[in-house]
């Protein structure tokens, strides 16, 4: 259904990940790379922005494992041209500019903001696995 509204989506899927998605994945003992491919039934490229890495660095010792995970070469590191932007703002702006991304998040506020951007699939951690959110009814009627 997303592909009818967003023709730029297609395998290999690029998934923008936020800090809490990475942290929830670790807490639920999910291998991000394998679990994304199992969920989407296709090759997936997890993407991390500089803002997300900076946010993990600011969170300190508690998030050191998540920070170490982002250094994995299988993650695509996306550079940010702005300074001091909140990571959620960075993700929303990037998705609005480039409709080729899916977004992995468990942040309720970020999900609410992203639902306003047509054709952007959301992935979240639920019941020890990843789940793709259904397309909203207002988009389905377009």
PLM features: residue spans?
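Nuclease catalytic cores that cleave nucleic-acid phosphodiester bonds
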Residues: 47-142
């Amino acid at each position: 259904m997303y592909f009818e509204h967003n023709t730029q989506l297609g395998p290999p899927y690029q998934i923008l990940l936020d800090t809490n998605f990475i942290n929830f994945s670790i807490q639920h003992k999910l291998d991000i790379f394998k679990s994304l491919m199992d969920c989407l039934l296709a090759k997936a490229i997890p993407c991390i922005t500089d803002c997300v890495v900076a946010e993990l660095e600011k969170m300190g010792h508690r998030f050191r494992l998540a920070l170490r995970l982002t250094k994995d070469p299988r993650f695509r590191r996306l550079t940010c041209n702005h300074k001091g932007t909140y990571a959620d703002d960075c993700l929303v702006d990037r998705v609005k500019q480039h409709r080729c991304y899916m977004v992995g998040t468990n942040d309720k506020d970020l999900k609410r903001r992203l639902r306003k951007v047509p054709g952007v699939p959301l992935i979240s951690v639920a019941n020890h696995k990843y789940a793709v959110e259904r397309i909203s009814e207002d988009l389905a009627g377009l």
